[in-house]
Amino acid sequence: MENSLKIKDIPKNERPKEKLLSYGADTLNNSELLAIILRTGTKGENVLQLSNRLLSEFQGLDGILEASLDDITSIKGIKEGKASQILALAELFRRFRTFKSADRDIKIMSPNDIAMLINGEMSLLKQEILKVIFLNTKNIVIGTKDVFKGSLNTSIVHPREIFKEAVNKSSTKIIICHNHPSGDPTPSKEDINITLRIKECGEIMGIQLLDHIIIGKNGFISLKEKGFI
């Protein structure tokens, strides 16, 4: 039966590891790459079949990278060992996207530049986070910081925390960004109120709020482009 087919029964040049070594990682599909990470299958299922099932259950690689420990271990045959391998892969991906951008000066010229900087990291988050990007007079990024976690509202978002960090970094401009775990980046009334409050405080302190970017699953919205800044 196909379900009992073992990796060793697959022609050697079609096995993920051998294929990678012979032809390069870029020749492998997502299922084959995931199979190399997982290394082994489960009872009655080889590692390629397991990888295909995971990709199907989570509707693609994005879904796997967004999954929590409970999400992954709820899948039949997946224990904490394999779940930890997947979670480690997801964390490496997030860190790569963050640290890659730190290797060079980044100049912000448009909302697209902001989205390119943070989208890979923030679009995968399941908890709402407010991130601040600090810039110098030339719009070069000089730092970022997550300042709030959880549902955002004007009662918990304190501008002093944002501007204290901006002053410490000698930042003359800031951009605030947060994600909507629902996937819909449409700004809420609270999002707009928070934006206006931070903008007003910035004007008093001489630190300009350039934009507020809201990240969704498949896109983003710039409150500056929408006319709120």
From Swiss-Prot:
Disulfide bonds: none
Any one Pfam family match given in the protein's UniProt record, by short name: UPF0758_N
Swiss-Prot/TrEMBL keywords: Hydrolase, Metal-binding, Metalloprotease, Protease, Zinc
GO biological process, one term: proteolysis
GO MF annotation: an example: metal ion binding
Chain positions recorded as Zn(2+) binding sites: 178, 180, 191
Motif (JAMM motif): 178-191
Chain ranges of the MPN domain: 107-229
Sequence similarity: Belongs to the UPF0758 family.
Protein name, entry field: UPF0758 protein CLH_0547
Organism: Clostridium botulinum (strain Alaska E43 / Type E3)
